Amino acid sequence: MIDLAVCMALQEAGYGVYGDTLFFGVSPVLDSGSVSSTFGLYVNSQTVDVQGDLYTDGITISSRYDDVLEQGLTMYKLLWWVNNDFRSTCSLSCEPISTLRFDHVRVYPCKGVDFDAIDGQGRWVKSIRFDVSYKLLPIFD
């Protein structure tokens, strides 16, 4: 669910609207290898390390745009945002979708921009990747 929290942070930062141009838990690259026709930013996470109650997830923000210039500028702004403003984040919230929160958050610098797939018209799905460490809060007490 850390991917939903990052998605909500993107919405708060003005990168789009959840469910319209911001998505989590789905990929713009389909199982057939083809590319989704829905444009926007897709946020996904995968656990890369667990040390006691400290979790580290790899976050991927994939971009799918019709306009290559808009995509390039968005990726540039995202790199800056993650490496500057977002890195100072101490907690993340999944609100208003869920009441789940993540405290004691540490955001690591981006690892770069990758090309994940290409559609039938030569447009790329580009992604940035970075790690986020966090502690789980006891929500089921």
Feature roles, as predicted:
Residues T56-T60:
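Short, solvent-exposed beta-strand edge segments and adjacent coil->beta transition regions
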Residues I61-D67, V132-Y134:
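Short beta-strand-to-loop capping motifs
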Residues M1-A9, Q46-L54, I97-D141:
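Short, charged interaction patches at domain edges and termini
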Residues V35, D53-Y55, G72:
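Alpha-helix initiation and capping sites
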Residues Y65-C94:
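Extracellular/virion structural assembly segments
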Residues M1-Q51, D85-R101:
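Small/polar-rich, solvent-exposed N-terminal microdomains that initiate assembly or binding
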